[in-house]
From Swiss-Prot:
Family designation: Belongs to the malic enzymes family.
Protein name: NAD-dependent malic enzyme
Keywords, in A-Z order: Metal-binding, NAD, Oxidoreductase
Phylogenetic classification of the source organism: Bacteria, Pseudomonadati, Pseudomonadota, Gammaproteobacteria, Alteromonadales
PROSITE patterns listed in its UniProt record: MALIC_ENZYMES
Entry annotation: catalytic residues: 101, 172
Gene (UniProt): maeA
Residues holding a divalent metal cation: 243-244, 267
Organism, as annotated: Shewanella denitrificans (strain OS217 / ATCC BAA-1090 / DSM 15013)
Cofactor: record remark: Divalent metal cations. Prefers magnesium or manganese.
Binding site for NAD(+): 154, 267, 415
Enzyme nomenclature, EC number: 1.1.1.38
Annotated InterPro entries: Aminoacid_DH-like_N_sf, Malic_enzyme_CS, Malic_N_dom, Malic_N_dom_sf, Malic_NAD-bd, Malic_OxRdtase, NAD(P)-bd_dom_sf, NAD_malic_enz_proteobac
Amino acid sequence: MDDTKRPLYLPFAGPAILEAPLINKGSAFSEEERIFFNLEGLLPYVIETIEEQAARAYAQFSNFSNDLDKHIYLRNIQDTNETLFYRLVRNNITEMMPIIYTPTVGLACERFSKNYRRNRGLFISYSNKDRIDDILNNSTRHKVKVIVVTDGERILGLGDQGIGGMGIPIGKLSLYTSCGGISPAYTLPITLDVGTDNQELLDDPMYMGWRHRRIEGQDYADFVEAFMEAVHRRWPDVLIQFEDFAQRNAMPLLERYKDQYCCFNDDIQGTAAVTVGSLLAASKAANTQLSKQRVVFLGAGSAGCGIAEAIVAQMISEGISEAQARSQVFMVDRLGLLQDNTANLLPFQQKLAQSSATVSQWHIEGDSVSLLNVINNAKPTVLIGVSGSPGQFTEAVIRAMHLHCPRPIVFPLSNPTSRVEATPEDVLNWTNGQALVATGSPFEPVTIGDETFEIAQCNNSFIFPGIGLGVLACRAKRVSDEMLMASSRALAECSPLGTTRTGSLLPKLDDIQKVSKYIAFAVAKVAMAQGLALPLTDELLNKSIEKNFWEPKYRRYKRTSF
């Protein structure tokens, strides 16, 4: 049944309704509602539809000249009338997604304290570590089903932003709703304020976080443990997404909790899933398989290694051995190629290190096995950037790759735009329009000669909303590796280029809600097959997906007793 057709009974009236963003309708309150809820005189005379409100809001939005001001404007609507906010974003998803999330959200995080206006979500400070249960009970959202949590240490490619990192959970949950149909009433952004090592923030009199160096080691681990246990007590079935934790914490936290709670790390697993899905589509478009590709990474942190492990798993599923799959994946960091004799490798890097005996037979120019050396010797067909270092895919690197690969796949994925390893225009110019390009941030189409290329945005928003919707639809208890792999394959099946050999590598953002539902179905099917969710027929699963897919429409309100 469509919930928008049923009335919602409210026990309060007057200005309190206008101050509640989840139920405020603004000028759309009917005459009857204005009388019953003591709103007469508090609103202008005209009663508008949500589309009329959205048209005015879009006109106001268009008057702003820079993206940060547009972001602030949209956040203000979100904080006053969430239904209108999501109608506006749904109507203009391609234009507004870069404003509410990457790349603009990075600037919003940097200026979070200076631009702070109104509370949203929860800030849990280390100094309040003994009162986490009380803080969770203070939330204005009571039926929470999805949490995005960060500690603000590795915000996009911008580093430690302290509590300014709250912009990321807010933005991510906005996409859970805009793209995946998760009701905003069921979402909660959380920042774990464990201090900051950003001296600029510590010295800033406007900084609103806990002025303390970051808590580390066992104190940090105990704090996160207390948080996870408290969340589980408050909302036992909630889905928790870890977001923008530093490399040294991201993988250990994921390994510790992924089999204990329903959780995943979007930087590691979501990025891996969307990248593998994009690579599957690109491989299909080139009439080959992922297992036949040779892949070079620039960036060997938790995100890069997470993608690499997902690629290895997909290659193995296509029939090659694990040893063969790992021999086709090359990880390069700022010191050069990761090898089995490289000092101080992190545990998650060790299995991805190349054999030094093999590398010793290469022709190396210079003192280290640089990215260009790897390109010249490994002769890759795929190049992926997750380094956060702009301009690293130089003309020499791209031309060297194109020299031995007629149709190279190049994914400069670092966010925000200022951190991208190469622009799509440069990559396409250096390969005479032959490269298959996808980026982490949005870019305008590129014209080479008479041909215009749509630039696919290899953005996690194609994956995590569908995962969330699938988890809610089947009430999954965990997020397994197999569920994530299913999301990759489902995304590849939605690729225009992969299915028709024409168009973009990834679907248009206008189709993202359909894609999310398709991914949700695939994810839920695997969860049920693994015994991690309620057993449902395909018909019941589709009904559950539709039931859980919230639409930004106003409901009728009726008065109940105080």
